[in-house]
Amino acid sequence: FSQKIRAGKNAQLTDDFMIIARIESLILERGMEDALKRATAFVKAGADGIMIHSRKKDPAEILEFCDKFRMVNTETPLVVVPSSFNTITEEELAVHGVNLVIYANQLTRSAFPAMQDTAREILKYHRAKEVDDRLLPIKDIITLIDTL
């Protein structure tokens, strides 16, 4: 994987582009040492950041990784995705050297139940009037588009 990172960095045309290397060692239960070894190799290959991920609900192994990584590297941005370990705050993560928190699927997962409820109501009444109070006005959607 280091070769792919190196190739990506060699092909980079602008500083506005970053390569963030995702470490799957903890998810695959390959251990902390494997995760740290990969992170070090990926940074050496040119990765601009490291993303560490875990499927455990307890954030302890993520914090352990962050602390150990920060002992040898204080500069490279650290990224986490707290989908499983969702009790930890951004502030707590920052104390352990995390620079970026990605909420990868929470918005999508929360939107689906609302869409299902709306679809049920439309199917039940064969019209959309009953769901009007749940809808974002079109003018607000246009405002959102204009700000992009």
Segments the model singles out, each with a brief description of its role:
Residues 1-101, 110-120:
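Alpha/beta enzyme core
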Residues 106-148:
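Extended, intrinsically disordered, low-complexity segments
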